[in-house]
Amino acid sequence: MSQHSGGLSRRRFLAGCAGALALAPLLGHGLRAEAAAPGRLRVAQYKGGDRLLLEAAGLADTPYPIDWAEFASGNLMVEAMNGGSLDLAYGSEIPPLFGFIKGARIRVVGVIKGDVNEQTVLVPKDSPIRLIADLKGKRVGYVRATTTQYYLTKMLAEVGLSFADIEAINLTVPDGAAAFRTGQLDAWAIYGYSVPLAQSNAGARVLKRANGYLSGNYLFFASPEAIADPPRHAAIADFFVRLQKAFAWRQANPERYAAALAAEIGVPVEAVLALLRNESQVRRLVPVDDAAIRSQQDVADTFLKAGVIERPVDVRPLWDGSFAAALAG
């Protein structure tokens, strides 16, 4: 497998991107490593994430304090939670799976049904690459242990290719943005607000979207300690109810939400509205159920077949249904 994932070769690669973008730290901004105070929640988010949404919807006045920490990817959230620095986070099905395989102390407690059209493979606007098959031998950036590794694996397999047929380069989101912007990548598998940013700032073109390759399940995961602690458990339940209401507000007020998000992430409002109009499904937060567990099991089985993981994994012990009552409301 032709992959770069660290060490001298990766440092040399990134040297060509130096100064292009300010690289974000690997761990969350505002992260607190000490034990949480009673009822206090330490919550991870992405840039322009749940904090902004709750504030825009007028639902941020929680009766418990929240320490927000910003991360670029779900795998970093898993690492921070396993280190005792977070109570609650969310990401795709993939980061909790890899964390679980490595013994991380996390449990999946809720499921966001969300958009997959903003999960993409990007290429430069004037690139001759028109099909996934054209990626053979090309430099393709991705983020290991995230959706990008999963849907890129499936897209390549569909045209008879694998990671061994491309020059796959594992990069953090900020590093990938710098590499793509400076022409160090032929393609970039990426997600979220990085897509409109790359389109706006680097003239990116969407080669292929991940609709049809991903379930659209994004998993809230919590630390076992937070789940077992009554004040934090109650705070998480209340947080979930507020977020359900905020998602409904977002659906009813796309222009107001787009204006707030565009100002936060630094892209034109119309770019955000285009993403919202193109969403693959209405965003909502639902309880853990058997279908969601089966979906993550399918992900694990796909990675096993592709040789990404070495042995079969039963994901059921990763899941916790103790917030079902709060989420069912």
Question: Predicted segment positions?
Answer:
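Sec/Tat-exported extracytoplasmic proteins
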Residues: 85, 90, 100, 139, ...
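Short, glycine-/small- and polar/acidic-enriched structural segments
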Residues: 36-162, 169-170, 186-192, 207, ...
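Conserved C-terminal helix/tail region of periplasmic/extracytoplasmic solute-binding proteins
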Residues: 301-329
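Solvent-exposed, polar/charged alpha-helical surfaces in well-ordered, non-transmembrane soluble domains
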Residues: 79, 83, 133, 150-154, ...
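C-terminal segment of classical bacterial N-terminal signal peptides
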Residues: 24-32
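N-terminal secretory signal peptides and thylakoid transit peptides that target proteins
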Residues: 2-24
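Pocket-lining segment of extracytoplasmic ligand-binding domains
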Residues: 94, 175-263
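Secondary-structure end/capping motifs
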Residues: 229-308
